[in-house]
From Swiss-Prot:
This is Putative glutamate--cysteine ligase 2. It catalyses: L-cysteine + L-glutamate + ATP = gamma-L-glutamyl-L-cysteine + ADP + phosphate + H(+). Pfam families: GCS2. One of its GO terms (molecular function) is ATP binding. ATP-dependent carboxylate-amine ligase which exhibits weak glutamate--cysteine ligase activity.
Length: 380
């Protein structure tokens, strides 16, 4: 990903039974083989046998991303359907038993589970990650500092983990609560520039706190493999269009933040505000009240998005479509909203608690296919 402003998307999925909605703790070798065959180089293993990751190629446009990811979703979904298996893309599963999941046995993941024990075992969650390429010579820590304040808004737009272990957690993104159990997985440390980042990394490596090839899992980070800044705060998005809107907004934000220096550089105050907004985003999602950076006044999620658009004018058709879809998400709801609504409806229709949770899981899997959630005239 060498060209600036190109981007890539990583999506994590759980493999689940399409009839029961239950996560498959030990998918058959044939299912795993089919995933590899269908995805090729875009297939990646994840922490659990029941989890996979789809790593996109490098894209130049949202149209290109929509075409590739949409076709991938359709083909893989249909192929796995032959086995009675579906792809569960929300950030948490409503009734999966994490203690029954089998960790993947490769050396990398064995080390991860050995180091982090129960924290790793509990992390049966899916995220959406977006890489954006930046020009050579860019100080990526300075760039991260300029976009830091807006990160919780991306979490608001993606929330999809309200249900966990058979319960309503009260959070819109319980995944971020689980992420908080890990070291180096919240907001990035207050590092002024790339030199400070290198000193911090070197300190942890010298003292044995970070392996030589170790990584930070911050909500946003400079990638070690690519010349990119990687957004990691987002919950997994079952609907393709929601993930594309987030990718489009993030790409637009990074591109414009690099060109301007007026007002969003990180101060202690901005970090305080961002940390508070981060918690509110996880707890309340789109119904939360947040703190504006400029006037430090309460602002709704819709008002917050409008502030982003005023700071970041939609100067392309792609940017305008991304803002339009983001407004639709805030108006109609995220996956977290739809899961709670589906659970309430299932209970009203007489399903017991466990069966109602499985109905939620089946609905999430149905949203995997392209076009879910779009008005008919907008399905490409």
């Amino acid at each position: 990903m060498a060209r600036p402003w190109t981007f890539g998307i990583e999506e994590e999925y759980l493999l689940a039974d399409t009839t029961s909605g239950q996560v498959l703790a030990s998918p058959s070798p044939a299912v795993t083989r089919r995933c590899r065959e269908m995805l090729g180089a875009t297939f990646a293993e994840e922490m659990f046998l029941s989890q996979i990751e789809v790593v996109s190629p490098v894209f130049d446009s949202l149209h290109q991303a929509r075409s590739f990811l949409g076709e991938n979703r359709q083909r893989l979904g249909e192929a796995l359907g032959d086995f009675g298996v579906g792809l569960y893309g929300a950030a948490s599963h409503p009734c999966a038993q994490w203690l029954r999941q089998h960790p993947r046995g490769t050396a990398h993941f064995r080390q991860l589970f050995d180091d982090y024990r129960l924290v790793a075992r509990r992390s049966l969650v899916n995220g959406l990650h977006v890489h954006v390429g930046v020009p050579a010579g860019t100080d990526r820590m300075q760039l991260i500092n300029r976009v830091l304040y807006w990160l919780p808004l991306f979490l608001v737009l993606s929330t999809s983990s309200p249900l966990w272990g058979g319960q309503d957690t009260g959070y819109m993104s319980y995944r971020r609560v689980i992420c908080g159990e890990w070291p180096h997985m919240g907001l990035p440390e207050p590092l002024a520039d790339w030199h400070a980042y290198q000193r911090y990394r070197g300190l942890l490596q010298r003292t044995g706190a970070l392996a030589e090839d170790g990584d930070f899992w911050w909500a946003i980070r400079p990638s070690r493999r690519f010349p990119t800044v990687e957004l990691r705060i987002c919950d997994g998005c079952p609907r393709l269009e929601d993930g594309l809107a987030i990718a489009g907004l993030y790409r637009h934000l990074v591109q414009h933040a690099l060109a301007r220096h007026d007002g969003m550089a990180v101060s202690r105050e901005i970090r305080w505000i961002t940390q508070e907004n981060y918690w509110r985003a996880a707890r309340y999602g789109r119904r939360g009240t947040f703190i504006g950076a400029v006037d430090q006044q309460p602002v709704s999620a819709e008002g917050w998005l409008a502030q982003l658009q005023s700071w970041l004018p939609a100067d392309s058709a792609e940017a305008e479509r991304s803002f339009m879809q983001a407004r639709r998400i805030l108006r109609e709801g995220t996956s977290a909203d739809r899961q709670r609504e589906a659970y309430a409806l299932a209970r009203e229709n007489g399903l017991a608690g466990r069966e109602a949770l499985r109905a939620v899981a089946r609905q999430v899997m149905a949203e995997h296919f392209p076009g879910a959630g779009l008005p008919q005239g907008e399905i490409e």
